[in-house]
Amino acid sequence: MKLNQFARLTPDFKVQVAELKQIGLQADPDDAFSQSATDLFNAFFPEAYTLAAKEDKLAQVAVNMDQTLAAWLAKKPSKMTRRDFYNVALQLLGFEAFTDFDLNDPFKMMTATKLPSLDHDLTSTADLLKAVYLLLNTRTKHLVSYLDDLANRGFLKDFQKKQKKPTHLLFNGKVQQVFDARQAVREVVWIESDMDTDHDGQRDLLEATIYRPKATDQGLKVPVLFTANPYFHGTNDVTAVTHVPETTLAVKTHGASKAEVTANPEEPANLPHHPVNGEATQAEAYAEENSMYAFNDYFLARGFAVVYSAGVGTRYSDGFRTTGGPEETDGAVAVIEWLTGKRRAFTNRTDGITIKAWWSTGLVAMTGKSYLATLAMAAATTGVDGLKTIVADAGISSWYDYYRENGLVVAPGGFQGEDADVLAVDTFSRQKSGGDLINIKQAWEKHLATITHDQDRTTGAYNTWWDARNYRKNANKVKADVVLIHGLNDWNVKPTNAIKFWEAIADLPIQKKLVLHQGQHVYVHNVRSLDFLDMMNLWLTHELLGEANGAEDVLPNVVVQDNVAVQTWSAYQNFASPAAEHVTNTRNLKTDFEAATDQFTDHATATFNAQHDTSASFETAIITPNSAYANSRLWLTQPPLERDQTLEGIPHLELTLAIDAPTGILSVRLIDLGMAKRFGETAATVALNGLQLGFDYKTTDILEFKPTAKPTPSKLISLGHINLQNPKNAYEVQRITPGQPFHISLDLQPTHYHLPAGRQLALVIHGADMAQTIRPIKTTHYQIDLANSSITLPYRI
């Protein structure tokens, strides 16, 4: 086990003492050592209410091989050895003597686990207080810090009773759980937008669900974590509308210019406002939906309000879904504007009674994963006031990069046949209310047909519809600080979405952080080896509470999880830069790779059908040395590596080839070859319900990325797809003459990948990708000019 920690601060001793006193500990350096030790260790068992109960708890802790903590304290000691203190500390952190560590040498385990310690014996009360302060900020076996663990057991439950008025509590630069999340006020309001997406002549009203600390009713104003969640009110069965992958790749007869595919923002309609008949300070509707994001729940107990809005076209709101369109961005912005006092909301949809977010400080962070993170990124590119930061996990920065690639229809990994119209149906939760649906069904079906037409599955080309859903082109407007989290094995929302957004905001005068993990489309807030919750606590305390805690400097710019060394996270200044830390090597496909042939015929669809394969089984087979698809691919290998190497950046392919057809699909996979136990792409549960989100509150599982039980022969590092008629970009078209050579350039997905010595790099070039592209029936023959083809690989040095 490794408990990496990036968010721990080391303030001077006076600050440490003041903070210890603030959380209710006896922390006077002039007190006798024995009295201070007794007071402190007794305080660490808040679940024990009497001295007798505390004595029993102390007797359960071993100081060394000879005595318990209760017996040691009874001797009124005047000092404590470093070894004895950390024997006690480890047990307080949840580790077991004799099982997890040796009482004769706790430091061996602490070093391996990356737990901090003082480097000397405790010979004074000041030493003891320093050790206790560090202990409180040390991570436990249960992922959270020791102070968090104490608070989960009731240590801070009476904090507010001792204050003249409700307040936030900060410790080590981070806000603490001193609010009872069980008592949160739950309410619903309807925010007036500027849009009429269902074309009924009225501004769409957008439902927003609010959970705010009860202390706001006593005058406390709080910042807000806002999650724009289209799934919040449920989803629909999309089996009937999911596309069957087409069997013919269209020959494109004409392309377009950049100007022709550039979307121009539409002027907002001059719609009348909903009438106002009065104002209220209390909502009329209870929030019946439960909060569904553990990250937000964690901060609710720390004095942040949490707001969800599903947006246009969802249950209890007006409008129609647009799958990432400007209307969905505007809907998220409308919620922020209400939270900052710049837009009206109503207590219900009919009476015209307005209500303000009077409990809000007007400082907002947007959070969430996938579609939720996408809307956070979209809102940030508007530059809306009040949005201080986004914490965006696996977000889409351009919807073309989600459903298309280089002129091809490309499904997100794991969802073959999905497209923008399918997702619109999936999230159109208004249809769950029959009384609502009967009034809008015809108009919705007409609207949906427009999406199906405009997404253009025939050519897969980039057009104005997709351009309107490319948030990166407005990245220069971003004013909010940005945290991006992404899985390096996320073939659903592929890594290019994060890295291209990261590059787009690189020169902006904002703070930005990037976390890259080895998972697929998953959260990391409950991964034990990373102190992600503490990192974001430090970040949000700075961003939303205005604490000068140095978060922008303490937290690394880039944190990346290693794919070989277990539970290892490394800090870097940037991704794929600066030049002093990186090098690119261009390798010729003929002289630097071994290949049995330079040509293949793509029979993948026939093989797929004959094998009764699935998308998942195809993805395994296409990168397996001995495969049923061996004749439908080109397999190129490099010699085994003589030393460890780390790929970091965007692999780039230059390829000269000829095909026997006027169009074709080319897929490329970069492979790590060699039998090994590699990480699973989904973190495994290591403690069921082990992460507690607040005192007597919700729990969630603790996870960890682990190597697979059995070795595998290969693993996908990166991939790319291209329509061979689109060698330059996704809108200009090249005519292909069958049998005549032509050239293409292709960027693969960004990666950070550690290749150990002895492994081999392999390059797989094939045609249709059964898991992601369409599935042509017609076979195509590919002839690759290896001598005039190359791949450029980026390395961290």
From Swiss-Prot:
Q: Does the keyword DNA damage apply?
A: no
Which molecular function terms from Gene Ontology are attached?
A: aminopeptidase activity; dipeptidyl-peptidase activity; serine-type peptidase activity
Active-site residues per Swiss-Prot or TrEMBL entry: S370, D490, H521
In terms of Pfam families, this protein maps to: Peptidase_S15, PepX_C, PepX_N
Main enzyme class: hydrolase
What is catalysed by this protein? Hydrolyzes Xaa-Pro-|- bonds to release unblocked, N-terminal dipeptides from substrates including Ala-Pro-|-p-nitroanilide and (sequentially) Tyr-Pro-|-Phe-Pro-|-Gly-Pro-|-Ile
What are the UniProt keywords, alphabetically? Aminopeptidase, Cytoplasm, Hydrolase, Protease, Serine protease
Q: Where in the cell is it found?
A: Cytoplasm
Tell me which Gene Ontology terms the entry assigns under biological process.
Answer: proteolysis
Task: Kindly give the SUPFAM superfamilies that the UniProt entry links to this protein.
Answer: alpha/beta-Hydrolases (SSF53474), Galactose-binding domain-like (SSF49785), X-Prolyl dipeptidyl aminopeptidase PepX, N-terminal domain (SSF81761)
Please provide, in alphabetical order, the Gene Ontology terms of the cellular component aspect for this entry. cytoplasm
Q: Does the keyword Cytoplasm apply?
A: yes
Which InterPro entries does UniProt cross-reference here?
A: AB_hydrolase_fold, Galactose-bd-like_sf, Pept_S15_Xpro, PepX_N_dom, PepX_N_dom_sf, Xaa-Pro-like_dom, Xaa-Pro_dipept_C
EC number(s) per UniProt?
A: 3.4.14.11
Family, according to the entry, reads as follows:
Belongs to the peptidase S15 family.
The UniProt function text for this chain reads:
Removes N-terminal dipeptides sequentially from polypeptides having unsubstituted N-termini provided that the penultimate residue is proline.
Q: How does it assemble?
A: Homodimer.
Q: In its UniProt entry, what is this protein called?
A: Xaa-Pro dipeptidyl-peptidase
Q: Per the UniProt entry, what species is this protein from, by scientific name?
A: Lacticaseibacillus casei (strain BL23) (Lactobacillus casei)
Give the lineage: Bacteria, Bacillati, Bacillota, Bacilli, Lactobacillales
Gene name of the encoded protein: pepX
